[in-house]
Curated annotation (Swiss-Prot):
Keywords: Chloroplast, Membrane, NAD, NADP, Plastid, Plastoquinone, Quinone, Thylakoid, Translocase, Transmembrane, Transmembrane helix. This is NAD(P)H-quinone oxidoreductase chain 4, chloroplastic. Pfam families: Proton_antipo_M. It is a multi-pass membrane protein.
Length: 500
């Protein structure tokens, strides 16, 4: 048990400090904006300090544990703790949220509510990644949905209400299965405190019941990740959301589904995961091809990037399904890698829209000359998205490939077939990625528009882009910086499996 409540402070600081926004003096949006950025920076620095000085990398067990009685009558506990699996997503959340807050500068309507919702979302995401209690995990999972719905419905495009409604129907529908499974799992055959992760991990279930729990949780995570065919909310949501919200969706929210799949399904329900893993591999392989084939047909720039996210998230599903050290480490690395790349692409798409007021690719063209900085950064992140060697996407996807090939669970021919189909998907990625850059930046279409004068990226946009680009290059050159966080925890998780 931790002697000082570091994690509790980290979880509650954003939402509590965010509540003070409504009491700030009415002197324009500048005070609100800088106050929010300072809170995000303080939270990020506090998180980094805690992990640097109080977290042991070589210990696969839960660290900085906190356990407080919450609701005595129901024996509910406030349990928090971190390990190598959660530390990466938590740091990613702090980094992306801070930059998304900086990116939200153009938002002026209801600025107080907007920034409060971003901070509330911050707390929900940190709470989900650090929860050690099934009920607390569910509460944080749901807490994070409400701000997203409001951010979509109030600061989106013309079809924002449709997109927000579709988002909440999909995610709340998936959460119903989570809500049904958690009480059953927490209360089944145990006299110890219910809902504790450790208690649930040591609990053995009948095979049929474990499969039922697994399938229910899988539906909830398949909506968030997303996994086909439960992905259709994502393109609509990204197409209408403000780009700072898109950064949080692509960078963090999608990763919560993959995290839950590892943390609960894989760690707490190993026998069912061993049964379902071939199906995860098959669905993930289909998803790579499907999303990469669908993306080129999208006229909307942000929808095309959204489908590329669906394709790249499939590598995480495949890595989790491989049940190997290499594959799971590759999946965790892809969670971090795509968090940076996806957030950056949506940010640059949004800044481009702010200048040319166009979102359809067939209406764009020729903006490379008037906006060379945006062109350079967008092209760089497009290269990262198509897994160019030397960047994080290449390392993550390559490790997932090795995880499939070295998996003893699958026969030789299925492994070759899956690898071949995934390779086709990787070939399709440059097609939609490079064609997107060609339609945006090359040609002369926008030069024929009267008064076509466009302002290039300013210091704020350049700063955000470089801050995201540096980790992408850093992880691509030295991936062990991220892998060292999770490697011991991955071995501990896979020790429950017979197929290593």
């Amino acid at each position: 048990m931790s002697s000082f409540p570091w994690l509790t402070i980290i979880v509650v600081l954003p939402i509590f400090a965010g509540s003070s926004i409504f009491f700030l003096p009415h002197r324009g949006n500048k005070i609100v904006r800088w106050y929010t950025i300072c809170i995000c920076l303080l939270e990020l620095l506090l998180t980094t300090y805690t992990f640097c000085y109080h977290f042991q990398l070589d210990d696969p067990l839960i660290q900085l544990e906190e356990d407080y009685k919450w609701i005595n009558i129901f024996d509910f506990h406030w349990r928090l703790g971190i390990d190598g699996l959660s530390i990466g997503p938590i740091l990613l959340t702090g980094f992306i949220t801070t930059l998304a807050t900086l990116a939200a500068r153009p938002v002026t309507r209801d600025s107080r509510l907007f920034h409060f919702l971003m901070l509330a979302m911050y707390s929900g995401q940190i709470g989900s990644f650090s929860s050690r209690d099934l009920l607390l995990f569910f509460i944080m999972w749901e807490l994070e949905l409400i701000p997203v719905y409001l951010l979509l419905s109030m600061w989106g495009g013309k079809k924002r209400l449709y997109s927000a409604t579709k988002f909440i129907l999909y995610t709340a529908g998936g959460s119903i299965f989570l809500l049904m499974g958690i009480p059953g799992m927490g209360l089944y055959g145990s006299n110890q405190p219910p809902f504790n992760f450790e208690t649930s991990a040591n609990q053995s279930y009948p095979v049929a019941l474990e499969i039922l729990f697994y399938f229910g949780f899988l539906i909830a995570y398949a909506v968030k990740s997303p996994i086909i065919p439960l992905h259709t909310w994502l393109p609509d949501t990204h197409g209408e959301a403000h780009y700072s919200t898109c950064m949080l969706l692509a960078g963090i929210l999608l990763k919560m589904g993959a995290y839950g799949l590892v943390r609960i399904n894989m760690e707490l329900l190993p026998h069912a995961h061993s049964i379902f893993s071939p199906w995860l591999m098959i669905v993930g392989t289909i998803q790579v091809i499907y999303a990469a084939s669908t993306s080129p047909g999208q006229r909307n720039l942000k929808k095309r990037i959204a489908y590329s996210s669906v394709s790249h998230m499939a590598f995480i599903i495949i890595g989790i399904g491989s049940i190997t050290d290499t594959g799971l480490n590759g999946a965790i690395l892809q969670i971090i890698s795509h968090g940076f790349i996806g957030a950056a692409l949506f940010f640059l798409a949004g800044t481009s829209y702010d200048r040319i007021r166009l979102i359809y690719l067939d209406e764009m063209g020729g903006i490379a000359i008037p906006m060379p900085k945006i062109f350079t950064m967008f092209s760089s992140f497009s290269m990262a998205s198509l897994a160019l060697p030397g960047m994080s996407g290449f390392v993550a996807e390559s490790i997932v490939f090795f995880g499939i090939i070295t998996s003893p669970k699958y026969f030789f021919m299925p492994k070759i077939l899956i690898t071949f189909v995934m390779a086709i998907g990787m070939i399709l990625t440059p097609i939609y990625s490079l064609s997107m850059s060609r339609q945006m930046f090359y040609g002369y279409k926008l030069f024929n528009v009267p008064n076509s004068y466009f302002v290039d990226s300013g210091p704020r946009e350049l700063f955000v882009s470089i801050c995201i680009f540096l980790p992408v290059i850093g992880i691509g050159i030295y991936p062990d910086f991220v892998l060292s966080l999770s490697v011991d925890k991955v071995e501990a998780i896979l020790s429950n499996y017979f197929h290593r």
